[in-house]
Design a protein with these regions (language model features):
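Penicillin-recognizing serine hydrolase domain
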Residues: 16-20, 50, 54-81, 180-345
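Active-site-adjacent loops and short helices of periplasmic peptidoglycan-processing enzymes
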Residues: 43-217, 221-230, 287
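N-terminal propeptides/low-complexity segments immediately following signal peptides
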Residues: 10-47, 341-344
Length: 345
């Protein structure tokens, strides 16, 4: 049997039987549409990939923080912070070093220098000063719980700057300083020079300006110097602070949760964060009976600097024989050059 096959064109094929010009236009439109679709697809894929990368980084940072609970102190000490320095405050022995001489924005770690300049100046800590429009953050647009017109003593402003990292408090200390903000900044930089902080520069009293830069090595010197001030030690390690604002009590918590952790004996603390600086944390703490200065800079993720600090504590406690604590008054920090990639145990 011979079966005859009749070829019936598909509708699309039949529709394509049009004048050549029209077919050319249709093909061009199709190619343009296909190209547009590919570009859109690539953009969507790239966007999704970027978003996924951010999520993975955040997840990784959180995991690193919580992983500190499982860290045994035996395996090599590896920190997430991009720049870090851990030293014995008594002996200057370097426990851990990572990019110690790399200049980086330091955010609110700046406020330790702000407090030292005020305390060195001899101005009355009980004198009330006023928060004005000049203290509003127009650079980063950060909020504040201190309304314009708030009157507080310099002592209260120091506490708010060091405990809650209140930017208007730190700003008001500078704007109301004899000679004004410019003179205050000059004295911040003069103090840095006197401490041997050769890679440090200050442009404001809050740390919101990313041109406030320093290194892990310089900040170890600053932490050691700040530790000599009772006011700074007491304020920076206070877990919370209450003041009256507009005739109402206001409660401020310390930005470093470790001061509320019974596993830690902290003698000085300051956190910092702006996008350019990453998460920063500097501390003086007793570890295995020894005074240790910890500088953690440019850490990604809200929890990673805390995880790093916990890993440092466990490593030191596991690898150091407890020794009697020595007198810490005026212990100089004179660090030499450190290999930027070195990990010294």
């Amino acid at each position: 049997m011979v079966v005859g096959l009749v070829l019936v064109p598909f509708e699309s094929e039949a529709a394509s039987k049009k004048p050549r010009k029209s077919a050319t236009v249709s093909t061009a439109k199709h190619k343009a549409s296909a190209k547009s679709s590919r570009i859109k697809s690539q953009r969507v894929t790239k966007y999704k990939s970027s978003r996924m990368s951010v999520k993975l980084r955040k997840s990784s940072a959180i995991n690193q923080a919580y992983a500190a609970d499982d860290y045994d102190g035996i395996s090599p000490l590896n920190l997430a912070s991009a720049k870090a320095l851990v030293i014995n405050q008594n002996t200057n022995e370097i426990i851990y070093a990572k990019n110690t001489n790399a200049p980086t924005p330091i955010a609110s770690v700046t406020k330790l220098m702000t407090a030292m300049v005020i305390l060195d100046s001899g101005v009355s800590l009980q004198e009330e000063v006023t928060v004005t429009n000049a203290d509003v953050d127009y650079l980063k647009g950060t909020s504040s719980r201190l309304p314009i017109g708030t009157r507080l003593t310099r002592d209260e402003l120091i506490n708010l700057a060091l405990i809650a990292s209140e930017n208007r408090a730190a700003s008001a200390l500078a704007t109301t300083y004899p000679g004004g903000r410019a003179q205050f900044i000059r004295e911040m930089n003069q103090k840095a020079i006197s401490l041997g902080m050769v890679n440090t520069h200050f442009s404001d009293s809050t740390g919101l300006d990313s041109s406030n830069v320093s290194t892990a090595e310089d900040l170890a010197k600053m932490v050691n110097a700040a530790y000599q001030y009772d006011v700074i030690r007491n304020a920076s390690t206070t877990s919370s602070y209450d003041v009256y604002l507009s005739n109402r009590p206001a409660h401020f918590n310390n930005t470093n949760s470790l001061v509320r952790n019974s596993d830690w004996v902290i003698g000085l603390s300051k956190t910092g964060f702006i996008n350019e600086a990453g998460r920063c944390l500097v501390m003086q703490a007793q570890l295995a009976g020894e005074p240790v200065i910890i500088v953690l800079l440019d850490s990604f993720g809200k929890y990673s600097r805390i995880g790093d600090a916990n890993r440092v504590r466990k490593w030191v406690e596991h690898n150091t024989e407890p020794k009697p604590t020595q007198d810490l008054d005026a212990v100089p920090i004179t660090l030499g050059q450190v290999d930027s990639t070195a990990q010294l145990n």
